[in-house]
Amino acid sequence: MAKAKFERTKPHVNIGTIGHVDHGKTSLTAAITIILAKTGGAKATAYDQIDAAPEEKERGITISTAHVEYETNNRHYAHVDCPGHADYVKNMITGAAQMDGAILVVSAADGPMPQTREHILLAKQVGVPAMVVFLNKVDMVDDPDLLELVEMEVRELLSKYGFPGNEIPIIKGSALQALEGKPEGEKAINELMNAVDSYIPQPIRATDKPFLMPIEDVFSISGRGTVVTGRVESGIIKVGEEIEIVGLKNTQKTTCTGVEMFRKLLDEGQSGDNVGILLRGTKREEVERGQVLAKPGSIKPHDKFEAEVYVLSKEEGGRHTPFTNDYRPQFYFRTTDVTGTIKLPFDKQMVMPGDNATFSVELIKPIAMQEGLKFSIREGGRTVGAGVVTRINN
């Protein structure tokens, strides 16, 4: 049989397994690929292939992540699985592997554990929109009352962290039985994928979001005006549309009078394009790197926010010492550094290298931001942390 060419006819969704160490995340990932491979929806990938996750660098941070892909009747999935707890924390905070949804794996024999809680909290903080639960290792539990108790605990925990605990599908099964080819194991995997297909919402495509482009460079072209360059982050910009210049200074309105890519003139630029945009009546000194061009009214500048942050360990090239309240590093948003002051919660004296923490920040200049925006923390040009805006405070 000739090899089928990969055609993107199905909608694409990014997903990942989360949960406590040894509850069976990697076994489940392997089981999904092996079961879906039977219908040609995946390449069967063994446990040890996934477990030997390659290291990747994202914003100066080394993260081990395994990627597999598979498809159901309805969708194409890219699935990420991490070997260690620290990799999950880093992955979710840096957004190295964007998650449109998650499969929370909980061992029925152990119930929710500390990392179960931490992963649910992180998923909430970084804006993972939905999750489905796989109650694993049910073959090790003889008592149906105990299973029911664990399910109740999981639902309560999800509700506590702001997920709809009563609605979330919980599938009971055994990844090991699925890997061994037992019918009840296989049935549970198929049930799980049906739940993922129907419960995890289709992500909004970047082109359907409001236009936004971080400014990387500004040029003056004699006789034509000011051109700003950058990579369109979301949406579409058409010639003749009104746009706003947001961040660092007062918001200004202008009009796009030209879009250029690879020295060719276009009618529009869309997310992912590296473009130059000609601005009507805007002077060279009125725009700078670090601002953004955006659809009017779609984004506002802010200087106070709360964040979930991973602080690099000394081994990762981070700080050698903890930092305390009023620490003033640089916050790198999109294309620029802005100095800010960190305010720790009253019950936290210091943050150690290698920790993840929640704290508030006040920047010296406002930046165009929305919840979910990622940033790096830098000190003297080196990255010492990575974070995500969880709440805007002004």
Curated annotation (Swiss-Prot):
Residues 81-84 are annotated as: G3. It catalyses: GTP + H2O = GDP + phosphate + H(+). Gene3D superfamilies: P-loop containing nucleotide triphosphate hydrolases, Translation factors. It is found in: Cytoplasm. Residues 60-64 are annotated as: G2. Residues 136-139 are annotated as: G4. It comes from the Bacteria. InterPro entries: EF-Tu_GTP-bd, EF-Tu_GTPase, EFTu-like_2, EFTU_2, G_TR_CS, P-loop_NTPase, Small_GTP-bd, T_Tr_GTP-bd_dom. Residues 19-26 are annotated as: G1. Residues 174-176 are annotated as: G5. Residues 10-204 form the tr-type G domain. PROSITE patterns: G_TR_1 (PS00301), G_TR_2 (PS51722). GO terms for molecular function: GTP binding; GTPase activity; guanosine tetraphosphate binding; translation elongation factor activity. One of its GO terms (cellular component) is cytoplasm. PANTHER family: ELONGATION FACTOR TU, MITOCHONDRIAL (PTHR43721:SF22), ELONGATION FACTOR TU-RELATED (PTHR43721). GTP hydrolase that promotes the GTP-dependent binding of aminoacyl-tRNA to the A-site of ribosomes during protein biosynthesis. Belongs to the TRAFAC class translation factor GTPase superfamily. Classic translation factor GTPase family. EF-Tu/EF-1A subfamily. Monomer. This is Elongation factor Tu. The gene is tuf.
